[in-house]
Amino acid sequence: MIKWVAAIIGYSMLRFPGAILGFVIGRFFEFLSQDSIRIRTSSYSIKPEIFQLNLLSLSALIIKADGVVQQKELEFVRSFFIGQYGKERADSIFRTFNTQIKKETQHLDQLTRVFIQQTTYETRLQILHFLFGIANADGHISDVELQKLSQIASGMRLRLPDFESIKAMFVKNTDNAYKILEIDSNANQDDIKKAYRKMAKKYHPDKLRGQDPAMIKGAEEKFREVQKAYEALIRQKNN
């Protein structure tokens, strides 16, 4: 916005050369006004430390959902954070969580509200994908964990077909590929191809450019699952 105002002022003073100069100067001030430590996409902005601590808080809700803290689930979260942020940063996140946040009661609606207000829909899809990974770390997702995941998805205002699509990646049954592509089992090849294009666009990692690296990795995994589901259904239809 600043660059355009500056361009107009420049034009009124020096005509076309002034417009160019005003645009450049305005763009420079816009750059200075951006907080470089924020994760940004369109009109959404969230500080990395806020994102990471809230993500860890949601992780804790899943780990404690069935009343039993599984070591594999703890290791999954720790390995994930170390892999995405490095050991030093991950240790700092865990320290802050343990000393400042863990002792407090975590309210689901407060946590999800942060993500609704400060992240894109695509980012929230990847958060859900990550949480499913935690629940499945011990090789099984309990009904209680599924219920908690459903509550989180609802709290983050995710569509039911999107929830079912991600769920199908972890809870296996015969029509998983259809659920991943969010189509009916009676779909023909044209329906499958159309659904694939839609899902590939929705989950393409490029849509999360500039977002937290952990969410980009989740998008890449989901994108691969969409491709696998599409290929499986096309093979099935051709047989």
Task: Locate each region found by the language model.
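Small-residue-enriched hydrophobic alpha-helices in membranes
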Residues: 1-64, 68-239
